[in-house]
Each structure stands twice: as structure tokens, then as C-alpha cells.
């Protein structure tokens, strides 16, 4: 262990493998007249935390003593004893308390901690990440209070941090998660040719007070029309124009096809000159009653409009029915497109602009964007998704946590939780790797073995 008062924690790493032997004497007192197996099980279950924390403390003290000896041997007479500094860490196997030895270095005019010269110790925290990691997953799936209970259930002594501490520490973990993969060095086509975009509202708070609501927005894409979806961009409070700028930096080429629910601003920001914009047909059918309601027509007065809308054949297809359409049968596709356009024109004549301003604008938008899939099929022979259902499926796994369990968020907290939920839902392997990295499983492993075991009955 090459000790050197460098001023940096871990400045004296273990240069080669060394073995520390701990001679442990364990005394087991067995009372008479007790169910022995059950009593032993309970005793060792209670003892496990004490045993491991005692051994862990002994190892730290041994490393500290050796490092101090090496420092004093390398720099004779340089250091003066300055007492100790108490430290405490809550680890997965229980609490560890240690008095860190302090040495005064008059040459460098600073305090030297031998143990910090040998290893990097957790700074300014009592609850170590290794203890909190099992609770982070429950924070994503359920809530921070459930996360706190999970940590308490795993701790040998039943201790747990407050849910406020879990929330605060979770932010650092979530900041390491990015649901947008790095495509910089990936060969082949990027998953931005076929994009889907959607947004929703999220309530925010600032310093405990209502801060209104912000737009929660998500853009996903795939390499083929029906290929696996990957996150291209996610945001809280950003406009579609800001999202478009980030997408153009990652993917300079505009998408071939863009599918949205018709939210204002999506096609203007995300679509390029050659992009085909397809309106989600599920939202198209669902949003007509709201447009009529905006024009002041209650349910009893809008049946004739809804019936005429239902006679547009191109808006009634589902994805399975479209898959059964023969792409080589151009006359049949052209007939379906023309019939749909004629039905749209008939509906348009029933909607004078003076009486139906919102509904007329809504229907005119659907004539172009709602039937885009038929024009694309006629021109290329290729089917595209008719709805944002696959994107809505991703939303369903995220919004339960963000809008039902958690009701109010700060903007950074909402963004961190959105990232964690997306990574957990779409890339579980990457989430598991992030947990493993937090536990240090990527580092060279220390081997702990019981090399000999001998039992002796006391006389």
C-alpha cells in the first residue's frame, strides 16, 4: 500500500493484492430446555448484522493502522497525532461507527487522514448508496414511502431513512439514467425515420406551493413503420420548437412519417417538407364530440353529425383490418380513398363555418392528415401505424407514477422520475446495470473467505 499524503481521498491505492487474516473467537451460549434449532436460527439472524459490522470495522482499522505505519516510515517525524474524528455509515448489513485517526502535517499545513489516503470514503452522507439501491426500484414502481419501508425491511436492525432522504438521494441516481440511447457511434439507420409524439399536462410545485402545470412531452421513433420504439426526446416544460431543435442536432434528417394526436404545434415543429403527417384515428374519432361541444351543441343535437362522421370508411379501419388490405390492389385502395374523401366533403357541407367553427376546422384537418396512410399505401405499398396506441402504452407505464401516485412535482424532480420510469419500462437491462454500477459491481472484487473453522466445547 503505497502511502502518500496527496491531499486526495484514495491517493494511496492498493498496489498489489494483500491478504488480511482475522482470527475470530465466537462464543455461543446454549440454554437448557429450549427448542434448539429455532433458538439458533433466531440468534444467528440477530447476530448477522453485529458480526459483519464488527468484521468490517476491524478491516477498516487494520487498513488505517497499516497506512499510518507506512506514512510514518516514509516520512519519519513529519506527522503529529491530532486525535480522531467520529464517522458513521449505514450499510446494508448494519451501522458502522469508526473514529478516524487524524494526523497533522506541518510541512503541507493540513490534516491527514490515513484511512482516506488508502481509500475513498463516502462524503457528507450517513446512508450509503449500497443501502438505498433496493429502495430506488420501489420508488419508481410505487412511492418513496414504500421505498422507505422496503429499506427498513432489508436492514438487520430495522432502520431506514426518512422518505424525504430517499427522495433527495434518488435524484442523484436518476440523473445518471438517460432513456435516449447514444447513437453517435452506432452504425446503420437511426430510429428517427418513423416518429410518434404526444404530450400531457403535469402539476408542478415550487417550495411547497402550487406552481401551475407544465407540458410533459415525449417523442419516440423506430427504424421501420412497425419496429420497436425507442425514446428520442423527453421533456418537462419545453415547447415543441425546443424539442425540434434537440432532435435536429441528434438526427439532422427529418422523419419520413410523423404520427400524432393532432396537438397544435407538433407537425409544424417536428415535420419536414417531405414528412408525411398521420393523425391518430383513435383520437380522431374520440375528439369529434368535444369539437361539437365547443360549438355549443349538446349530445342530443349532434347525432346527425356523428352519424355522418361514422360513414367515412377511411376513418373506421383498425390496424388489423389495414393489415388485411392487399397493398398491390391499387384500384381497391383508390376506391376506399375516394369514398372517404367524398364522405368528408358531404360532412363538410353539413358544417357551415358560422355555426360549426371548431368542428369544421377539425374535420378539414382530418381530411388531409387522417387519410394520409391511404395515400402513402397507394404511393409506396407500405402500411404505417394508424394510431399512437404504442406510445400511449408507454405513457400508461409512466403516468400512473407521475400523475396518480405523485401529484405535485418540481420540474427537475419530474424530469428525473420520467427518465427513471422510461429506462425501467423500456430498457430494464440498462436499469439493472445502473443499479449494479451504484453497488460497485464493475470494480475489482474483494474476496472474503472462511479458510478454517474449528469448534471447541468449553469445559
Regions found by a protein language model. Give the residues of each.
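Acidic/histidine-rich catalytic cores and adjacent linkers
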Residues: 2-65, 253-275, 305-459
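RNase H-like nuclease fold core
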Residues: 2-33, 80-84, 88-89, 95-132, ...
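An N-terminal, globular interaction/scaffold subdomain
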Residues: 41-91, 98
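Short basic-aromatic helix/loop recognition motifs at nucleic-acid
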Residues: 135-142, 384-386
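DNA-recognition alpha helix
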Residues: 146-157
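Short, surface-exposed amphipathic charged segments that create phosphate/polyanion-binding patches used
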Residues: 209-214, 291-303
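Inter-helix linker motif
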Residues: 273-297
Amino acid at each position: 500500500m503505497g502511502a502518500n499524503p496527496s491531499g486526495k481521498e484514495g491517493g494511496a491505492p492498493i498496489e498489489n493484492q494483500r491478504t488480511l487474516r482475522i482470527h475470530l473467537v465466537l462464543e455461543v451460549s446454549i440454554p437448557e430446555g429450549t427448542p434448539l434449532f429455532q433458538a439458533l436460527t433466531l440468534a444467528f439472524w440477530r447476530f448477522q448484522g453485529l458480526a459483519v459490522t464488527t468484521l468490517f470495522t476491524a478491516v477498516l482499522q487494520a487498513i488505517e493502522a497499516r497506512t499510518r505505519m507506512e506514512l510514518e516510515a516514509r516520512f519519519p517525524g513529519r506527522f503529529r497525532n491530532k486525535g480522531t474524528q467520529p464517522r458513521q455509515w449505514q450499510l446494508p448489513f448494519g451501522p458502522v461507527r469508526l473514529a478516524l485517526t487524524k494526523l497533522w502535517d506541518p510541512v503541507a499545513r493540513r490534516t491527514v487522514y490515513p484511512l482516506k489516503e488508502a481509500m475513498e470514503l463516502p462524503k457528507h452522507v450517513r446512508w450509503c448508496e449500497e443501502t438505498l439501491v433496493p429502495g430506488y426500484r420501489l420508488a419508481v414502481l410505487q412511492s418513496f414511502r414504500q421505498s422507505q419501508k422496503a429499506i427498513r425491511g432489508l436492514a438487520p436492525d430495522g432502520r431506514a431513512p426518512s422518505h424525504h432522504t430517499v427522495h433527495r438521494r434518488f435524484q442523484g441516481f436518476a440523473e445518471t439514467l438517460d432513456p435516449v440511447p447514444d447513437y453517435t457511434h452506432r452504425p446503420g439507420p437511426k430510429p428517427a425515420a418513423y416518429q410518434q409524439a404526444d404530450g400531457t399536462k403535469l402539476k408542478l410545485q415550487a417550495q411547497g406551493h402550487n406552481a401551475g402545470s407544465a407540458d410533459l412531452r415525449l417523442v419516440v421513433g423506430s427504424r421501420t413503420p412497425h419496429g420497436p420504439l425507442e425514446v428520442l426526446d423527453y421533456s418537462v416544460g419545453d415547447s415543441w420548437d425546443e424539442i425540434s431543435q434537440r432532435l435536429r442536432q441528434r438526427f439532422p434528417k427529418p422523419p419520413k412519417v410523423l404520427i400524432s394526436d393532432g396537438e397544435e404545434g407538433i407537425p409544424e415543429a417536428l415535420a419536414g417538407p417531405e414528412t408525411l403527417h398521420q393523425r391518430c384515428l383513435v383520437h380522431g374519432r374520440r375528439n369529434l364530440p368535444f369539437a361539437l361541444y365547443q360549438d355549443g351543441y349538446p349530445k342530443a343535437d349532434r347525432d346527425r353529425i356523428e352519424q355522418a362522421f361514422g360513414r367515412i370508411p377511411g376513418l373506421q379501419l383498425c390496424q388489423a383490418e389495414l393489415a388485411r388490405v392487399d397493398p398491390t390492389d391499387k384500384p381497391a385502395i383508390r376506391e376506399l380513398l375516394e369514398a372517404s374523401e367524398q364522405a368528408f366533403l358531404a360532412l363538410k357541407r353539413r358544417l357551415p363555418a358560422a355555426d360549426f367553427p371548431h368542428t369544421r376546422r377539425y374535420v378539414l384537418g382530418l381530411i388531409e392528415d387522417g387519410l394520409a396512410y391511404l395515400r402513402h399505401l397507394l404511393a409506396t405499398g407500405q402500411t404505417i401505424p394508424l394510431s399512437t396506441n404504442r406510445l400511449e402504452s408507454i405513457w400508461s407505464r409512466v403516468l400512473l407514477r407521475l400523475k396518480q401516485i405523485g401529484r405535485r412535482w418540481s420540474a427537475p424532480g419530474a424530469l428525473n422520475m420520467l427518465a427513471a420510469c422510461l429506462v425501467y419500462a423500456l430498457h430494464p437491462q440498462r436499469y439493472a446495470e445502473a443499479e449494479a454500477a451504484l453497488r460497485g459491481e464493475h470494480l475489482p472484487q474483494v474476496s472474503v473467505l472462511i479458510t478454517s473453522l474449528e469448534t471447541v466445547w468449553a469445559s
